Each structure stands twice: as C-alpha cells, then as structure tokens.
Amino acid sequence: MAETNSRRRVAVLGGNRIPFARSDGAYANASNQDMFTAALDGLIDRFNLKGEKLDMVIGGAVLKHSRDFNLMRECALGTSLSPYTTAFDLQQACGTGLQSAIAAADGIAAGRYEVAAAGGVDTASDAPIALGNDLRQVLLGLRRAKSNVDRLKLVGKLPAAVGVEIPVNSEARTGMSMG
C-alpha cells in the first residue's frame, strides 16, 4: 500500500533582522528582549502585520538571564501583533535561529500553524552574570533561618562567599567553545 504524504508545503515569505554589531558597541545597553522585539517590529512593519495574530512566534537565545524565562512571549507582547499571538522559546548552541525556523516549518507542514515567525538573538553585552554558589547558599540560608542567631552566623559567612561567577561560552564537558 502506498504511503501518502499529508504534510503541507512550506514557504518562507520574508525576513527581517537588526544589523550585527560588536559586543559592547551599538547594542551595549540592549537586552535580548530589546533586540528580538526590534527585529520582530521590523518584520511587522515590512509585511503590514500590525494587529495580526500569528499562530506562533518561535525563537530564543543561548545567553539568557533568569528574567528571560518567557522571552519570545514577552517579545511578541512588546510588539503591535495581536496579544493572542502565541510564542515559545527554544535554545540550541550556535543554532537557535535555524532550529526555530525548522520548528516553525514543521508546525506549518503538519498543519498546526498557518503563519509563524522564527528567529534567534544573543548578546554578550548583557551577559547573565550569576552569583557564585557559596553566596547563593548563604542567601538561601538567610531566608530559611529560624532565628536571628542563625541569621547572624550566616551573615558572618558573607565576606568569604561574595564572588561573581562570569558565564563562559564553552561546553561544560569539554571546556571548548563553539564560537
């Protein structure tokens, strides 16, 4: 018995991007959200999509702050698209934008979406600098402490625990960078 292909054909109708810039240059004070929203705004203007509901906005970033937990949804809400436009994040080292486009195309081919936008964004200018694990443990301990004496004991550990953990662009198992 012959197998029929029920997947729909997919077409990329256009795109938009903001210019590349060196870290700590033109976008030194811009976040991932600022930059992706700007690119999405340009797409909306270019294709007259103001007020339109897209079936999905897919994208993401590799260097993300904890505040970026719902990055694509916040980006979509920051534009003039319909607030009913759905969005989700994904993340793949050196391939977030491409993986987003593949996910959008797959959703269209499978009939889950009619129209989708996809992309990726990253900035090293606004790198997510995290607290060191020792400081994090002291701060969490302060929150859980049952008495002032327990809190004072933990406060005494603060000077030794203060430290900044700067993220590195390397793979955890090999220590090598992909870019």
Question: What is the predicted function of each stretch?
Answer:
Residues 2-8, 22-51, 68-69, 76-77, ...:
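Acyl-thioester C-C bond-transforming condensing/cleaving domain
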Residues 13-14, 91:
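Residue-level detector of conserved, well-ordered beta-strand and adjacent loop positions
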Residues 15-20:
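Short polar catalytic/cofactor-binding loops
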Residues 53-60, 117:
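Short glycine-rich phosphate-binding loop at a beta-alpha junction
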Residues 61-67:
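Glycine-rich phosphate-binding loops at beta-strand->alpha-helix junctions
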